[in-house]
Amino acid sequence: MIKKLKCHCGEVEAEVKIPETGIEKFMRCNCSLCKRKGYIIGVIGENDFKLIKGEKILKLYQYYTKVAKHYFCSICGIHTHNRPRINPKIYGINIACIDDIDTFALKDVPVNNGENLSLIHI
């Protein structure tokens, strides 16, 4: 099924393809950036994400190795998606940006050990 992923102001919008049973892999990450964002990441394939609005206002944030790509809306500041360093062919999406997913209802969200995957520790 196709779901709409939108930032808070609605100026960045993407279509994400997820199975009928829902996002199969989701997690929190404890790397220095993700723990500060505090969001839940849904993992989808590279062919399951299509940006449909806001390409010009979408901003890129990179740090350390500059391999991972973290995207956010330059108007409202909401992080919408990323391309992780460990596998740049997949997308990590902010599942709170999909209106009909209740992130507060998710129980036992696993934690990815991104802190120990980083090359530099703060």
Predicted regions: what is each one?
Residues 1-120:
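A short Gly-Trp-Pro
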